[in-house]
Curated annotation (Swiss-Prot):
Family of the protein in this entry: Belongs to the YbaB/EbfC family.
Gene Ontology cellular-component annotations: bacterial nucleoid; cytosol
Residues spanning the membrane: none
InterPro entries in the record: YbaB-like_sf, YbaB/EbfC
RNA-binding as UniProt keyword: no
PANTHER family cross-referenced by the UniProt entry: NUCLEOID-ASSOCIATED PROTEIN YBAB (PTHR33449:SF1)
Keywords noted in UniProt: Cytoplasm, DNA-binding
Subunit comment: Homodimer.
Function per UniProt: Binds to DNA and alters its conformation. May be involved in regulation of gene expression, nucleoid organization and DNA protection.
Compartments where found: Cytoplasm, Nucleoid
GO molecular function: DNA binding
Protein name stated in the entry: Nucleoid-associated protein Adeh_3636
Length: 103
C-alpha cells in the first residue's frame, strides 16, 4: 500500500470537507407550521436566519399554541437543514460516512 498516495488522498478529503463546511452557511431551507402561520428559515449550520409569525397566530390567551407552532417550525427546519448538510458533506467526501461531520 502506498502511504504517500493515502496521505495525498487524506489531504484532498480534508480540503473537500473544509470547503463543504464553509458552504453550509450558504444552504437555505425553510419550514412552516400551522398552515404557514409560523415560518422559519435556517442555513445548513442550523442557524435560524429568519422567523416570521402571522399576526393571526398571536393570541394573548393562547400563548402555548404559538409556542407549539414555533417549536414545530424550528424542528422541521432543523431536520431539513441537517438533511441538506448531510447531502452536501456526502458529496464532499464521495459518500464516505464520517460521524459527527454534518448536523
Amino acid at each position: 500500500m502506498d502511504i504517500q498516495y493515502l496521505m495525498r488522498q487524506a489531504k484532498k478529503l480534508e480540503k473537500a470537507m473544509a470547503d463543504a463546511k464553509e458552504k453550509l452557511a450558504e444552504i437555505a431551507v425553510e419550514a412552516e407550521s400551522g398552515g404557514g402561520l409560523v415560518k422559519v428559515a435556517m442555513n445548513g449550520k442550523c442557524e435560524v436566519t429568519r422567523l416570521t409569525v402571522d399576526p393571526k397566530a398571536i393570541d394573548p390567551n393562547d400563548k402555548a399554541m404559538l409556542e407549539d407552532l414555533i417549536t414545530a417550525a424550528v424542528n422541521a427546519a432543523v431536520e431539513k437543514a441537517r438533511t441538506a448538510a448531510d447531502e452536501s458533506m456526502s458529496k464532499a467526501t464521495g459518500g464516505i460516512k464520517i460521524p459527527g461531520i454534518a448536523g
